[in-house]
Amino acid sequence: MSIFRKKKGAEGEYLACRFLKKQGYVILQKNYRKKYGEIDIIAQEGGDLVFVEVKTRSNSDWGSPVAAVTKQKQRKIIRVAQTYLAETELFDEAIRFDVIGIILDENSPPIFELIHNAFELEKFNGIF
């Protein structure tokens, strides 16, 4: 991954945290990594533990950033989330998976698209 893309991604994650805080989320952890994947943001919102994937783009020429969260990426996020739940012993928490897309065009303010419950754990049960 190029330095430009890493920098753009880090900027997107920073802006996503600010945006989510304004929406009432409490950020618990950023960049939770395991050898098989990463969760960008883990937060609490209402009574839910929320695993958030952040996708940042320079423009929408290739479509919405949230559309880049493929089924394969969803599986990785779910696998990492299951590890997080096991490590923290938060098995009884209500959880959900949100995706936030950010368009960072240098000529205009950032555009945010937040999708609550973007995908569900039940759809992938038994695949690991």
Curated annotation (Swiss-Prot):
Homology family: Belongs to the UPF0102 family.
CDD domains: PoNe_Nuclease (cd20736)
A GO term, aspect molecular function: nucleic acid binding
Pfam families in the record: UPF0102
UniProt cross-references to Gene3D superfamilies, sorted A to Z: 3.40.1350.10
InterPro entries per UniProt: Restrct_endonuc-II-like (IPR011335), tRNA_endonuc-like_dom_sf (IPR011856), UPF0102_YraN-like (IPR003509)
Organism of this sequence: Desulfotalea psychrophila (strain LSv54 / DSM 12343)
Cited HAMAP family: UPF0102
Protein name: UPF0102 protein DP2807
PANTHER family, alphabetized: UPF0102 PROTEIN YRAN
